Each structure stands twice: as C-alpha cells, then as structure tokens.
C-alpha cells in the first residue's frame, strides 16, 4: 500500500489528480482520469454516480481506504490523470489483491 501512496503523492505534486466525486464525474478530455480509487465508506448515491461514470468511460476503479493513501484531505474519491502513474497504480493494486 505504501507504493500506491507514493504514486498518488507523485500525481499530487505533478497536478495530475482529481479529488472528489463531482470533480471526477465532471472531467472530460485531457483531464479524464485513467484510474479512480474510492473509499469503501462512500455514500451510495456518490458510489453509483462514480461507478456509472467509470464503467461508461472504461476507467479502472478500485475500492480502498482513501484515508490511508491521502490522510491530509477529507476526500472519498481520487482520480489519477497521468497514464503512466495510473498504470503503475493499477499494476500495484492488482498485485496486492493477488497476494
């Protein structure tokens, strides 16, 4: 999980991240996230809205504890825009799930 946290930190520093369901769902064009990480405690309507958006646009989404990844911000969903960072995050989360 520490590696995922580091990748999210790089995305924050490079301004290649979206915070919150409304920002993620409202994204389009070059600002479209490649991967979305949402908290398990997210509200049902927000979760439905987020999953509908990710499924419609072919975006990978994972349910993790967002507070462990980014504790400084009270946020339930994170979208990573940078494709290379998103690919690294996807690969790391999948390897953690397979362990």
Which positions does each model-derived feature cover?
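Charged, alpha-helix-enriched surfaces in structured cytosolic catalytic cores
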Residues: 3, 45, 84, 88
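N-terminal first-folded block
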Residues: 3-35
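Positively charged, polar, low-complexity stretches
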Residues: 21-26, 45-71, 93-97
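Short glycine-/polar-rich loops that comprise or flank the Walker A/P-loop
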Residues: 32-33, 59, 73-74
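Short secondary-structure boundary segments
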Residues: 40
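C-terminal structural segments of small proteins and small subunits
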Residues: 67-99
